[in-house]
Amino acid sequence: MELSYPEKLTLIKLAELKRAKVEELVKESGLEQVAVMRALLGLQAKGLAKLHERSERVVKLTETGMKYAQIGLPEWRALKVLREKGKATLDDLKDVLSEDELKPIVGLLRREGWANVRKEDGKLVLEITEKGREASERPIDKALKLLAERGEVPVKEIEKLVPVNELKRRKIGEEDVITERVAEITEKGEELVKKGLELKKEVSVLTPELIKSGKWREVEFRKFDIKAPVRRIYPGKKQPYRAFLDKIRRRLIEMGFIEMTVDSLIETQFWNFDALFQPQNHPAREWTDTYQLKYPKVGSLPDEELVARVKAAHEHGGDTGSRGWGYVWSPERAMLLMPRAHGTALDARQLAKGVEIPGKYFTIQRVFRPDVLDRTHLIEFNQIDGFVVGEDLNFRHLLGILKRFAVEIAGAKKVKFLPDYYPFTEPSVQMSAYHPELGWVEFGGAGIFREEMTKALGIDVPVIAWGIGIDRLAMFKLGIDDIRYLFSYDLRWLREARLVW
């Protein structure tokens, strides 16, 4: 059996003592306490010794308590003055009491029955009583004396004299927990010592001096168990979800996508709905599905020509051949302000601003929707929106991009597409992926932007687009089953969450 030098020395000393406190072994062996503890743990793991621990609540003096142990409690110092003078004002007591001690002293002396209090010439006067003249040592005084003598006293012992809470209230004492460790040799350990242990100091560090002098040939090097468990180290790293978003962004840029810039979380309904060809009487625009700003309530519309084209698309389809929605479009409704409900509003802004054809664009943005918080829903979450614009794009291109997102980026094993409806896309599709804990989880929607939308924004070629809940993508990639964990303060998860890619 391989034993290190500290283990051998500790075991030999323990064999002599049979049972000993760690402090005794430190004294007998001449080793540091850390070395003795490490040796005992090693001996215990090898079945050569047992280590017993016993924790006990104790009371010890605070700084205030130490001061009182030297100069006396405030009431005794005040009583000394009263015994000499018979009576005294608060000013008379300032020579022996601090300002903090002076405030409660009147009530304390009165409660003990050591002084009567009255007013003379507008000043409080304390006059000693017979009980005050005869006052002698109380339980609290004995407790103070005991703590001063022994340093630490078990709570049970102090409680026989005075409640610990009373010492805490007066800031005389405080509680602590001490752990006593006692080592005991086993039969196996005794047998090994009887057989004889060669004490030869080991070297744990190969120094330049050992090499130069050649003494490295003579010394015994300490053996290290490379399989022994060690303390885990948690180096600093990015928040897991933040790191995931950064890698998604980098992957899309590598694929040739251009990131759309965003100035604000607040949109007018014009960009959030109207520019997307979503009618003003659509239920998704009501308070049950979106938030509205109380103040300020309205913003401004973009240039008149763009507004006129959007208005025409809503009322009669504009020059697309569509009949539109067939109602009178209200610019006042379009000016209402709201927190962005979906990232598609940014698609509309970018298309109106101008795009490269062919071109690929994306954005990762925070959006807001009223919802019931649960494992798969948040009221404030991130969404990845994007679109591809080009001459010959079709629905199959869109499905290919969506599947690539789910499989390559989220790591989903199974993906399915279902027909869906959105006012601004036709055809439209919903994408879901299978989560081992949650089952089928909806990722988001996609489709080909309708001409009523794209032509009003100045685009005459097909645009395929999608809006995906990237928080749910992250659930797959990070292996979690509760979306709220993405924003958790749980240190265990933050430390142990796996790194993606």
Swiss-Prot record:
Cofactor(s) required, per the database record: Mg(2+)
Source organism: Thermococcus kodakarensis (strain ATCC BAA-918 / JCM 12380 / KOD1) (Pyrococcus kodakaraensis (strain KOD1))
Reported temperature dependence: Optimum temperature is 95 degrees Celsius.
GO biological process: phenylalanyl-tRNA aminoacylation
Protein name, as recorded: Phenylalanine--tRNA ligase alpha subunit
Enzyme Commission number(s) of this protein: 6.1.1.20
Matches recorded under Gene3D superfamilies: 1.10.10.2320, 1.10.10.2330, 3.30.1370.240, Bira Bifunctional Protein, Domain 2 (3.30.930.10)
Family to which the UniProt record says this protein belongs: Belongs to the class-II aminoacyl-tRNA synthetase family. Phe-tRNA synthetase alpha subunit type 2 subfamily.
Protein encoded by which gene: pheS
Residues given in the record as L-phenylalanine binding sites: T344, Q383, I384, D385, F424, F449
Subunit structure: Tetramer of two alpha and two beta subunits.
A cellular-component GO term for this protein: cytoplasm
Class of enzymatic activity (EC top level): ligase
Subcellular location: Cytoplasm
Binding-site list for Mg(2+): E426
